[in-house]
Structures are given as structure tokens and as C-alpha cells.
Amino acid sequence: MILIRKIYRKIKSFLKVNWIKTIYINFKMLSFEQARRLPIVIFGKCSIQSLSGKIIFRSPVEFGMLGLGQRYEVFSKESGKAELNIQGKLIINSKAQFGYDYKIFIDKNAILTLGNMSSMASQAKIICTQNITLGDFCRLGSECQIIDTNFHNLKNVKTHEVFNKSNDIWLGGFNFISNRVSVLGKTVTSDYCIVASNTLLNKDYSSFGENIILGGIPAKLVKENIVRDWETEKENLENYLTIKL
């Protein structure tokens, strides 16, 4: 009976993978030596708009380093709206995950860097037109969006100052960012930062230091000397989120 259950789980996990698009993206974007290991795994439906850019791994390549549409949350039913558009560079330091129904856009000449065990949960949205970096174990909840541009040119009508349309984003390591958080251009967070749900990040918060909670629209310092218990969770997260078929 135990053996049957194990076989059933293996088959179920195998069938969740979109093998056609998994094979396609690996052999389209990587060298043969890297691609044959299938470091990128696509789960479920995914509309691939463009793969004209580059995907770069900064650690030894192995199976399942980047999970796209990976099921690791309480809810696991997708609506099939995942979308991938890579015209710039996607740099992956080690393992990273996106939940189901993600939308990723990397513009020409833009760079999106994902730290080890960084992730965005279901219905995540990234629009990268310049430079976005997620540190190691930077983890964002469902329905978060990271957008480094306002899409339109703005200027001061009195001084005629023209504002940058796009600005870099840096999210530090071991950040715990709750659901429905919006991260906009100019955002910088320190390591070991917690962000409350429904928060708007839009500036440099690094002067507040580490072990803090940010919250509000726009975000402000809510509490100090608070940290997620990463020492307890770190190993469990790596074991739970590593893709095994």
C-alpha cells in the first residue's frame, strides 16, 4: 500500500509538469550541456510571449533550479494565465520559485536577478525595464507586484525637471513580504525586513536597518527588533521547495 502511494505521488508530480514548454525553454535559452539537466521547470499552462533575451545561472546547474508555476501554497488550482516575456537578462543565483498564474516581463537591456531561494507566490507580477534584484531568501506572498517603471514621462511644470521613468529596485536578503504588496521603483530594503500585507514600497528604507516591520501606503516603519525565525525555517524551506520528481 505504501509503495502504491509513492508511485501515485510520483505519477501525479510528473503529470503536473508542462514537459513540452519545459524542454522548449531550456533548449532555447541554455547551452546543450545546461539544458539537458532541465534546470527550468514549467508547471501548468504558460503563454510564452518572447524568449529573445538570456537566462544565466550563477551556480552549478541541476534539475529544477527555477520553478515556474510551482505549487507550494495552500491553494493549488491555477486559472491558466501565466505569462513569460524575457527580452533582457534573467540571472538566477541558485534556486528560485514562482507560484501559479505568474506574469514576468523583462524588457530589452533590463536585468532581473533572483537570489537563492527567492520566490513570488501565486498571481505574482514582475515588470522589469531597468534593474530589479531579489536577495537570498527574499520571499513574497501571493498577488504581489514588482514594477520598476511608471510607463510614462513626468515633468515638473514649474521647473521643467523631467523625472526618470524607470528606477532600480533592490529587495534585501531574508525579506518576508506578505501578500498584495506593491513594490515600485527606487525601493531599497535591508536584509531581514518584514513587510505587512497591502503595503506600498516606493523609496529607500535601508536607513531603518535590519529586523524591522514596514507597513502602510506608502510604507513606514511599524516595528523594530522583529525578525522571521529563519534559523528554524531555512532548512525546511529548502527541502520543501526543492523540485523532486
Predicted regions and their residues:
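Histidine-centered active-site/metal-ligand motif
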Residues: 152
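Short, local alpha-helical segments
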Residues: 158, 176-178
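Conserved beta-strand->loop/alpha-helix structural units within folded catalytic cores of enzymes
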Residues: 178-179, 197-198
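Domain-scale signature associated with acetyltransferase and cell-envelope carbohydrate enzymes
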Residues: 1-147, 168-174, 181, 187, ...
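Flexible, solvent-exposed loop segments that connect beta-strands
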Residues: 155-162
